[in-house]
Every structure is written in C-alpha cells, then in structure tokens.
Swiss-Prot record:
Perinuclear space side: 47-71, 137-166, 248-273
Spans traversing the lipid bilayer: 26-46, 72-92, 116-136, 167-187, 227-247, 274-294
GO CC field: cytoplasm; nuclear envelope; nuclear membrane; nuclear pore; nuclear pore transmembrane ring
Protein name as annotated: Nucleoporin NDC1
Organism: Rattus norvegicus
A biological-process GO annotation: nuclear pore complex assembly
Highest taxon of the lineage: Eukaryota
A GO molecular-function annotation: protein-macromolecule adaptor activity
Polar residues bias spans: 408-422
Keywords: Membrane, mRNA transport, Nuclear pore complex, Nucleus, Phosphoprotein, Protein transport, Translocation, Transmembrane, Transmembrane helix, Transport
Gene name of this polypeptide: Ndc1
Region (Disordered): 406-425
Bilayer topology: Multi-pass membrane protein
Length: 673
C-alpha cells in the first residue's frame, strides 16, 4: 500500500495546512508533466514527417530536428503552457461534483465569469500550442505571411506578400480545441477528483491510464477537427478578412483553394496535421491533469496524537473536527478508513486515554465527527423525501407574525457543527421515527412527524389554499404521512378533512385568508406557468432531470462512506483491542444512528428513479463514479452494520435502543436483512 509519510503536527491557518499537505504534490505533478513534454514533442515530430518508404532517413531527420535550437525554444514555450494549464487544474479542482439539475443550469454554469476566464485562457494556450506545432511540421503552414505567386503581385512592394491561410487554419483550430477542452472540462466534471478505492503506487496508476489517454486523445481530436471544419466552413471568411485587412495582406487564391469551401477542406495532409496537433495538445494537457489527480488523491497519514499539545492543528482528531479545506477533510477521512483497517498501532492511539485526566479525547473527537456526518446524511434524506412528498411544489402563506428563527424544530434540523455536538443521544430514532412524535396538528397539514418548520424551510411557507380545500391539496395531504410513520385511523381522518379556512401555526398564531390581489397574482402565475410548460423549446431548457437531483443528494457521499467504514472498523476492532472500554460509552448512539440512517436509506430508495442505475461507461478517461455513489453508500451502510453485529453477536441485546431498533438489530443478527 502506497501512503505518503506525514510531517509533524504543526499549527497554522487552513491555507497553511493545505499547502503543507498538497504543496509538494502539486509541484511534483507539474515537474513530471514538464519532464514528459520532450517525449510528446519527439513523438509529434516523428509522426508529422512520416515517410514509410525511407524509414532510416525519416527517423534520422526527426532526431536532428528535435535537437535543433528552434525546437528547444518551442519546448520552453510549451513548458510555460503546461505550467499555466496545471495552475488552472489546481485552482478549479473539487472533491464534490457539480451536478446541474437542468440544461439551463448547465448553460449558466458554463457562462459563469470564472468559467469564461478558464475558456479564454485555454483558447489562448491552444493557439500557442498550434503555433508551435505548425512550425514544427515543416509544411505549408510554417508562417502566416508568404510571398504571392501571381505576377500581378509584383506591382508594388506592399503587394508582394500574401496571407497563408493554412497557418491561420492551424491557429484557429488550436484556439477551437483549447476552448472545446475547457467546455468539456466543466460539462464532464473533469475538475472532480475521484479518490481511488484501492490504493496503488503512483506509477501503476499512471501506467494504467496511459493507453486510455492516448486512445481518448485520438478520438476526441478527430471529433474536434470535424466540428472545427464545420465552423470554419460557415464562419472562416470572417477572421480571414479581418486579418487580411489589419495586416494589409492579400489572399492568394492561385496557390490553393480557399479553406472555407468544401474543396479546400478536402485536403488530407492539412487535416492529418491538424488532427495530429490536436492529439499532441490533448495528450500534454491530459497528462498534466492525470498526474495532478494521482498526486492529489494519494493517501496522507495524519498523526493521531501530537507530540506537543500546542502542535495539534494537523492531527487527525483536530482536522476532522475543524473546518479545513474540503480536500483535507476527505484525506483525513480516507486516512481514518485506512488506519481502522490496517494499522493496529494507530488504532491503539485512538482508543488511548489522555494523561493526566484519563479522558478518551481522540475517540470522542473522531466518533463525534463521524456521527455528525451520518446525522447530516439522515437529515438530508429526510428533507429530500419531504420535498418529494409534495412533488417539489413551493407554497407560500400569510401569517400574522413573521416566523421565529430559533424554534426548537428548526434547531433540531439545522446542520450540527462539530463544536455544538459534544455527544449524540442514544435514542436518535425517537426524534425522527417515533410514532409518539408523529401526531399531526393544525400547523402540519401534511401530517409529518417533523412539524411544519422543516417543510417550510424546504419549500417556503405553506399556501393557505392547501388548507382551504383547493383541488390539489387533498392529494398532497394524503401523500405526506406515508413517508415516515403509520398513522392511526384518527390521524388519517384528521388529515383527510382539514378545517376549511382557519388553521393554527406552530407558534399558535392564526392564518388569515389571502387578499384578492394575491389570489389574482397566484392565478396569473399559474396560467403563465401552464402556458410555458406547453412550449417544447422552453421545457427543453427548464425541465429538471430526476436523475440529476438524485445524484446531487449523494454528491458528497464519499466522505460518508469513509466515515461509515472507519467507524464500523474501529467499533469492531474495539471488541478485542479496546482495553479501557471507551467505545462502549458511545456504542448505543452509534447503533441507533446507523439503524436510523438505514431506515432513511430504505425509504429513500423506494422513491421513483432512486433505484434506477445510470448506464455504465467503461473504458472512459472521464470518471463517472459519482453517478452511482448512492448504491455504494447503501452497500457500505449495510456492510458496516453487519460488521458490528457479527463481531459483537448476542452482546448487542444489552445495548439500550428503541423497540423498533431492537427488532431491526435482531434481523441483522439473524442475517435476514
């Protein structure tokens, strides 16, 4: 297993920690990208001057060309391009993929000022690469200005030079390929850093990706050349006329056909060299991108205990419970998962007690953060299902007084911060799924066990029409309680027959009827919405894909998977390694949290489209594993519970838990889940 050695625990700001962890990795990836550049240039020179009938002369000329001073200058220029591309890789990376819910959201993302800057810089860098490639090909495209071939060009000195359209075609194709690379970079989430499931040496990971990189570059360059030829056929006359006018150059149509015609574009030699230039550009940029991903996602070993108390900012418990950059949080959780499985000595540090005092600070900090992450996922699934119960509709109402910001219901469902969660209550189930708390009142027309404040936070404030007998309210009301709890007959009758117009909010305030103006505005808004929904083009951009919203719920599930695996392995190892019994104090909370999350996941996968698997894209250079993270999370959750139950066995019957959780736990003990 390849893991990086850790440095000492040192204090500092989050940016200092980020630089200490990732700084040398970024520099090393850039250095290797530059060192591999001569290999790519040599391959480009060899294939650009291919001559199968004279192979000895072909290879000797290629080697002589590589050692020329001109190529060395281009090597330095291309090294600068690689460094700039690497800087943009570092600036735009993310560990949580961005999943747009509609085509309009994707367009808005592409047109963001940062993305536009990214595209512009890559277009300029692509033009620089194409300029170097055009000169190294030794063909008709070496220079933008060439002598005219016609006799009429000798009338005046200014008319003796003409524009070389081949060179212009090369430059514009490089800019187009650079922009296309940037466009696909965000559309395909290439800035997403997927962490490897199996830890391997960096060389093995790069060697495994090399053949796929070459294949992907060749195919993608072919499509880019096709698209550029189409664009140049329709709009190529615009830059050609502008450059001819700006530089006072003539267009020599006697030397070759214009390239913005079908006959001019059917130049096999030109298309081959442009395609080869695209392969060279994509390979050098993809190498830089792959090396950065390999180095950035390599496992990092955080020390569990600092040598001194004042030097604990980079230690595992402190990093997990602080707010570092997200990639540092991911690396810390990955390290927790690895130490829980493969490092008995570091597990002993987790189970150790502080001296003096005898407190399990390491275990408390680690378990608290893991339980906080799992509770966050439970709340996210709860809120998503509450939104799905109302079909994602937004409601609004008028209340006499504004809603309070610190109600107990809202406080219970806010994302807990690590500093605000000293411990997790042993019966998490009762706060979410207990039937005693699920009695609907007048403030909760949907009859959910969470009160109206949770739904209000998700979907705005409720519309009074849902309580006043609107045509759609009975369907929405009936669907609400079915998500979480089995309601009694009295509850069903109370929900099915809400009071006509008067209701009471959670704060005990009455809700008044909307004004005539408000009703008229609501009706007009519905009419406009219905009118636009019948237009195919508008719905093409505004319609939301259900798979995207489902993927967005689990977009950051990788760290929850590591929290599950790390916590469950530590609990299982504590059965024989925990000499002080520090895990036993939090075992009820851990089991109840896992079982609560298991029930939420089971109910989530009963929703439409949740169980549908997207098509697999095997053999692709772009990682799409984030699309199936929900299935990996469900499998990891069930495996984590089984790991604990098979280790402790019947001893778990003595753990304090609710009746439903005891029943669910017994099913795991009997391997019936």
């Amino acid at each position: 297993m390849a893991t990086a050695a850790s440095g000492p625990c040192a204090g500092g700001s989050p940016r200092d920690i980020l630089w200490r962890v990732l700084g040398w990795r970024i520099v090393t990836s850039v250095v290797w990208s530059v060192l591999l550049l001569p290999v790519c240039i040599t391959a480009f020179i060899v294939f650009s001057s291919i001559d199968l009938f004279h192979p000895i002369q072909w290879l000797s000329d290629s080697l002589n060309e590589f050692y020329s001073s001109q190529v060395i200058f281009y090597l330095l220029l291309l090294a600068v391009v690689i460094i700039i591309i690497s800087i943009f890789n570092v600036e735009f990376y993310t560990v949580v993929p961005s999943i747009p819910g509609s085509r309009l959201a994707l367009i808005a993302r592409i047109l963001h000022p940062q993305q536009l800057t990214h595209s512009f810089i890559h277009a300029v860098m692509g033009m620089a690469v194409a300029w170097c490639a055009a000169i190294m090909t030794k063909g008709q495209s070496r220079s933008l200005v060439v002598p005219c071939t016609g006799t009429e060009s000798l009338d005046s000195p200014a008319a003796q030079t003409c524009m070389n359209e081949y060179h212009l075609f090369f430059l514009l194709s490089g800019a187009f390929m650079g922009y296309s690379y940037s466009l696909l970079y965000f559309i395909n989430n290439m800035n997403y850093l997927p962490f490897p499931i199996i830890q391997q040496y960096k060389f093995l990971r790069f060697r495994r990706s090399l053949l796929l990189l070459v294949k992907h570059s060749c195919v993608e360059s072919l499509f880019m050349v096709r698209n550029f030829c189409i664009v140049y056929y329709f709009f190529g006359h615009i830059p050609k006329a502008w450059i001819s006018t700006a530089l006072d150059l003539r267009t020599d149509e006697q030397a070759h056909r214009p390239l913005d015609t079908i006959g001019g574009l059917l130049n096999v030699s030109l298309l081959y060299h442009v395609w080869l230039c695209g392969v060279f550009l994509l390979m050098t940029w993809y190498i830089s991108w792959i090396l950065f991903k390999i180095y950035a996602t390599e496992a990092y070993m955080f020390p569990v205990q600092p040598p001194f108390a004042e030097e604990s900012d980079e230690c595992l418990p402190k990093v997990l419970n602080s707010n570092p950059p997200l990639i540092i949080k991911y690396l810390a959780l990955q390290d927790l998962m690895l130490l829980s499985q493969y490092s008995p000595s570091r597990r002993q540090e987790v189970f150790s007690l502080s001296q003096p005092g005898g407190h399990p600070h390491n275990w408390t900090a680690i378990s608290r953060e893991c339980l906080s992450l799992l509770n966050d996922m439970t709340q996210k699934l709860v809120l998503y299902q509450e939104a799905a119960a109302t079909n994602g509709r937004m409601y609004s109402s008028y209340s006499v007084e504004p809603k309070r910001l610190s109600s107990p219901e809202e406080t219970a469902f806010q994302t807990p911060k690590p500093s605000q969660m000293p411990s997790v209550p042993p019966l998490v189930k009762t706060s979410l799924f207990s039937p005693k708390l699920s009695t609907p009142d007048g403030s909760s027309p949907f009859g959910t066990p969470f009160g109206s404040s949770v739904v209000n936070r998700m979907a705005g404030i409720f519309d009074v029409n849902t309580c006043c007998g609107s045509p759609q309210s009975p369907q929405l009301v009936r669907r609400g309680p079915r998500l979480w709890t089995h309601t009694s007959d009295q509850q069903v009758s109370a929900v099915s027959n809400p009071s006509p117009c008067a209701s009471v909010t959670a704060e005990g305030k009455t809700v008044r009827q909307p004004s005539v103006l408000y009703s008229w505005i609501q009706n007009k808004r519905e009419q406009i919405k219905n009118f636009l929904s019948k237009r195919v083009l508008i719905m093409y951009f505004f319609s939301k894909h259900p798979e995207a919203s489902i993927q967005a719920v689990f977009s950051d599930a990788q760290m929850h998977i590591w929290a599950l695996e790390g916590l469950s392995h530590l609990v299982a190892a504590s059965f024989t390694e925990d000499r002080f019994g520090v895990v036993q104090t939090t075992l009820p909370a851990i089991l109840n949290t896992l079982l609560t999350l298991q029930e939420a996941v089971d109910k989530y996968f009963k929703l439409p489209h949740a169980s549908s698997k997207p098509p697999r894209t095997s053999g692709s250079l772009v990682d799409t594993s984030y699309k199936t993270l929900r299935f990996a999370f469900r499998a990891s959750l069930k495996t984590a519970i089984y790991r604990i139950t098979t280790t402790f066995g019947e001893h778990l019957n003595a753990v304090q838990a609710s009746a439903e959780h005891q029943k669910r736990l017994q099913q795991f003990l009997e391997f019936k889940e």
